[in-house]
């Protein structure tokens, strides 16, 4: 199997071009290639193929083989791949994802894509669509918004704000994100009974009205160096809690992303880098 390893702010995936390769069991392949000791080493597998709705279609598989709806860092790398590998010559493209069609603007330097701006669409705040339920398992009303909501995890009470960007996110504000015990608390949120489909969790430190720092525990992949949808959800949570303005520079372990919310259209835009690391071939056992 031919592959290309790419990353967006350190959120790394193995990319397979389905115009050239055939994958019978991508979930199993994702588990195999993601292993950082016995495989290629990545946060998962992303396939790039044809779409009858958009210019391209991407599918995302986590390191545990589960399929994700959307990946913000991954979709920027898809844009770089299709342009740099001459599958398109357009700098405005559309990509079909599990969370709908996304529209991307490619910024090109010396015939290579360096940055990508993604229209991440509208944030989803309806609890049943995220999904998130009450601690007793009952449903929130559709017009309720889970903002600064108490949640018990690890014998502590926290406050979270829940947003979906096509996949579920719980955002928690902390004082010191660098020293936060992510490995301890991340799994407790991911598998909490309030999240019927599990959740991604962002732990966020506010630096100013236009700047924040975050770490992310991803559903199915543990801590990753960056999460594009999570960064968008984080900025929406900051705005909903009146902690920042509508345009925020977010520092992640693997780099920086700029997120802008446009109230007039209710759309979130993400701008950030995409990097190709290397290409190769691997025998899937």
UniProtKB/Swiss-Prot annotation:
One of its GO terms (molecular function) is diaminopimelate epimerase activity. The record marks 169, 218 as: Could be important to modulate the pK values of the two catalytic cysteine residues. Keywords: Amino-acid biosynthesis, Cytoplasm, Isomerase, Lysine biosynthesis. The active site is at residues 71, 227. Substrate binds at residues 11, 62, 72-73, 167, 200, 218-219, 228-229. It comes from Agathobacter rectalis (strain ATCC 33656 / DSM 3377 / JCM 17463 / KCTC 5835 / VPI 0990). The keyword Amino-acid biosynthesis applies. It is an enzyme of class 5 (isomerase). PROSITE patterns: DAP_EPIMERASE (PS01326). Homodimer. HAMAP family: DAP_epimerase. Belongs to the diaminopimelate epimerase family. It is found in: Cytoplasm. PANTHER family: DIAMINOPIMELATE EPIMERASE, DIAMINOPIMELATE EPIMERASE, CHLOROPLASTIC. This is Diaminopimelate epimerase. It catalyses: (2S,6S)-2,6-diaminopimelate = meso-2,6-diaminopimelate. Gene3D superfamilies: Diaminopimelate Epimerase, Chain A, domain 1. InterPro entries: DAP_epimerase_AS, DAP_epimerase_DapF. Its EC number is 5.1.1.7.
């Amino acid at each position: 199997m031919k592959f290309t390893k790419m990353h967006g702010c350190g959120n790394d995936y193995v990319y397979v071009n389905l115009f050239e390769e055939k994958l019978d069991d991508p979930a199993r392949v994702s588990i195999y290639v993601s292993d950082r000791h016995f495989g290629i080493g990545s946060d998962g597998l992303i396939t790039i193929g044809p779409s009858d709705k958009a210019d391209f279609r991407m599918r995302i598989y986590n390191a545990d083989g589960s399929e994700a709806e959307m990946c913000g860092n991954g979709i920027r790398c898809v844009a770089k791949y299709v342009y740099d590998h001459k599958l398109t010559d357009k700098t405005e493209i559309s990509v079909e994802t599990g969370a709908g069609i996304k529209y991307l603007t490619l910024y090109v330097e010396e015939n290579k894509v360096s940055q990508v701006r993604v229209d991440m669409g509208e944030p989803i705040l309806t609890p049943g669509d995220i999904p998130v339920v009450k601690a007793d398992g009952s449903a929130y009303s559709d017009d309720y918004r889970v903002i600064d909501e108490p949640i018990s995890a690890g014998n502590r009470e926290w406050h979270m704000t829940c947003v979906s960007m096509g996949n579920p996110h719980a955002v928690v504000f902390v004082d010191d994100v660098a020293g936060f015990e992510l490995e301890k608390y991340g799994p407790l949120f991911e598998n909490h009974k309030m999240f019927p489909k599990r959740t991604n969790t962002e732990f966020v430190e506010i630096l100013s009205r236009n700047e924040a720092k975050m770490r992310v525990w991803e559903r199915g992949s543990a801590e990753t160096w960056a999460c594009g949808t999570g960064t968008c959800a984080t900025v929406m949570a900051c705005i909903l809690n009146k902690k920042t303005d509508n345009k925020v520079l977010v520092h992640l372990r693997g780099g920086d992303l700029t997120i802008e919310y446009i109230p007039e259209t209710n759309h979130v835009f993400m701008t950030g880098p995409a990097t190709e690391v290397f290409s190769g071939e691997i025998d899937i056992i």
